[in-house]
Every structure is written in C-alpha cells, then in structure tokens.
Amino acid sequence: MSVRIIFFPDAQKALKNIRNSLKKTGTLGISVHGQKNKVPFFSNILDAVMEFIPDYVPRGSPDMDRFGTKNALDNEIRTAGFSKILIKDFTFNYSPGKFDDYWKNYLKYIAKPLKEKLNLLDMSKRKALKQVVKQNTIPYTKKNGIIVFPWQVLILTAKY
C-alpha cells in the first residue's frame, strides 16, 4: 500500500487505519516532499501569495511540508505503531520551463477556492505578485531563461 499522508488532516488516524488494513507481513510505502526550502517549486509561489493574501491557505489546513524531515516523518510513522522504518532522501532537479510557463501552469492547476482568492486581487496587486514570484525564481533561472528547481523527496517504507 502506498500513501501520501500530507493530505490527511489527522495523519495518526489515517495511519492507524492503514496499519489495521495491512497483513502482519505488510509494508507501508510513503513519499513526501521535503521542507519548503528544499522544494522551491512550491515555496516560491506560496510564500509570495501569502504576502498578498494572508488567508490564502485556510486556517487549520495541514502544512504541506509537515513531514518534510526524516525526523518528523519517522516520529509520525513510529507513533502509529509501525516498525523497521527506512527513509531515503532524494533530491532531483525539476524544470517547469521558463517563468511564464511556471506561472501559467500554477494558475491553471490550483484548486478552485484558491483560484477564486487570487482572482479577487486587483490587477495592480496581481502584477506585483507575479513580479515577487519572478524575483523568487531568479536563483534557479539559467541564462537561457529556463528555471531548474531542486526537489527533495523522502521515501519511507515501514513494516506492520
């Protein structure tokens, strides 16, 4: 069974239910993004948006990177009763293309409630937001204009 626990508000409840569904010889597999500073694909935009729309992410929503360290992930899984926990850390490069591609795809694929909040910004604030995001991408932008982000992923396996 493979699960991405960042989407569960009550991760312990979900993990315990998963554990109860596994055979005694079963293995759990989980992949999570690293901390936001190790996955700037997300943080470059999200940090900027939060400056313009403080309630962009609803209060009480789980942090996207709450399991983004080996220690946090290990603790969560161990607390749910799993054993023989192994976590591997991978960092790879990901390119969303040039800035306009990155920005347009973000706007295209965000959830409807978030898109509605962005659409409430007046045009001058939307332009300013886009400029802040563009500034955030500069450290990852090559001379040819292509953005290349590092992307950390933690992959965990654990036994029942």
Name every feature range the model reports, one short phrase each.
Residues 1-12, 34:
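A short SAM/SAH-binding and catalytic strip from SAM-dependent methyltransferases
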Residues 8, 12, 39, 123, ...:
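Non-membrane alpha-helical structural segments and their capping/turn regions in soluble enzymes
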Residues 12-97, 143:
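Conserved catalytic/acceptor-binding region of the Class I
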Residues 62-160:
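Conserved Class I S-adenosyl-L-methionine
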